[in-house]
Amino acid sequence: MAQEFSARFARHKDELEWLFMELYNNREGLEVLEREMADAYDARNAELKALDKARAADPNWYKRGNMFGMTMYTDLFAGNLKELAKKLPYFKEQKLTYLHLMPLLQMPHPHNDGGYAVEDFDTVDPALGTNKDLENLTRELRKAGISLCLDFVMNHTASTHRWAMATKAGDPWFQ
């Protein structure tokens, strides 16, 4: 585990553990989460680790008066992620500092609760592009000083999601 992650984790460990145990009362699950967090940090690229470090040094970065965001439906604004990337000059002209894209993740079609019935939290909806398209867009936004925001709302899980299917099938772990 990198020294920077270890130091940051140590600052927040007590709060994380308290919240997790209040919600789940599952010490083993907490240990799994902590290992997964360390593994995820190790897997982050150098560019994101540098951004983490800069933001940790300036914890109020997101409270500045120059923060200006835009929320949009990707499909309605640009059709897909590749077309959205072509709007970068417009975003820069607007002095955008963060962009919140809704909904973006794989969903069942046509019954998807306006895009909020998520079928796969790890995959961009094919109608909007690919995970690689999202990575490319994110990198270009970051170069322009724009942070990407996405929603991960677990109660927006589609009935066709593997978790829901396992629950319906009677899997006790998912129930």
Regions found by a protein language model. Give the residues of each.
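Acidic/aromatic-lined carbohydrate-recognition and catalytic surfaces
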Residues: 1-175
